[in-house]
């Protein structure tokens, strides 16, 4: 960058004279500094040399990562789906990895690992895998059944005001609230039905007068004067 100072003359209106001054002009060079270009060239050369010194397995992993992306599985596939991927590749070898990944909705790296693997379970291992799958299925059904029972007990507690046991913890009744005060609050499927236009019926009981006991008649001073 360089600066240039140029004398300037401006016409003064009204008197016909001139007013002197100095005009400052700043100019910027569009060419890059040679030292900056030399520094960038040295950095690129060192990175290239370091890349060449890496072992072959590191270069191979880097190439696979650049081609298929990072190894980040989104969900697990079943044994049958894994076998289907291998069968499709055997019958249609022209099918690309990215096409299989889009069909099964997983990453291309997962497809590459499945096709590269040659492990085949034996008969005993298949039986063990089958039993483990059945056990997990039974445990899931029991867990869902217990959860539905807890929801039903909570619904009854809110409806009838009774203490129930949920997950081994005894939950006491809440203030003696009666079932008629919470009618139609819960539906048959356990969901809450809340009506904002009729919410006063559950809380302050608007529209109902307070019951009071009638007192016996007693003569006062006005009756005696009359």
Swiss-Prot record:
Primary subcellular site in the record, as a coarse category:
mitochondrion
- Keywords in alphabetical order, please: Mitochondrion, Transit peptide
Q: Which InterPro entries match?
A: NGRN/Rrg9
**Location(s), subcellular:** Mitochondrion
Entry GO CC: mitochondrion; nucleus
Q: Transit peptide extent?
A: 1-25
Q: What does this protein do?
A: Required for respiratory activity and maintenance and expression of the mitochondrial genome.
Q: What family, per the record? A: Belongs to the RRG9 family.
| Full protein name | Required for respiratory growth protein 9, mitochondrial
Q: Which gene encodes it?
A: RRG9
């Amino acid at each position: 960058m360089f600066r240039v100072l140029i004398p300037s003359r401006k016409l003064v209106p009204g008197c016909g004279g001139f007013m002197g001054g100095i005009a400052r002009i700043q100019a910027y060079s569009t060419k890059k500094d040679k030292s900056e270009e030399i520094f960038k060239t040295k950095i690129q050369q060192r990175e290239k040399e370091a890349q060449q010194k890496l072992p072959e397995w590191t270069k191979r992993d880097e190439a696979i990562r650049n081609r298929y992306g990072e190894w980040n599985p989104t969900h697990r596939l079943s044994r049958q789906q894994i076998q289907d991927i291998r069968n499709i590749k055997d019958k249609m070898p022209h099918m690309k990895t990215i096409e299989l990944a889009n069909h099964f909705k997983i990453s291309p790296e997962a497809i590459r690992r499945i096709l590269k693997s040659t492990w085949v379970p034996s008969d005993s291992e298949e039986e063990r895998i089958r039993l483990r799958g059945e056990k997990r299925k039974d445990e899931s059904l029991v867990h869902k059944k217990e959860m539905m029972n807890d929801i039903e007990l909570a619904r009854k507690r809110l409806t009838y005001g009774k203490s129930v046991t949920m997950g081994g913890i005894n939950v006491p009744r809440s203030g003696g609230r009666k079932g008629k005060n919470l009618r139609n609050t819960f539906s048959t499927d356990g969901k809450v039905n809340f009506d904002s236009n009729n919410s006063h019926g559950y809380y302050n009981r608007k529209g109902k007068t307070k019951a009071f006991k009638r007192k016996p008649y007693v003569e006062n001073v006005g009756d005696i004067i009359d």
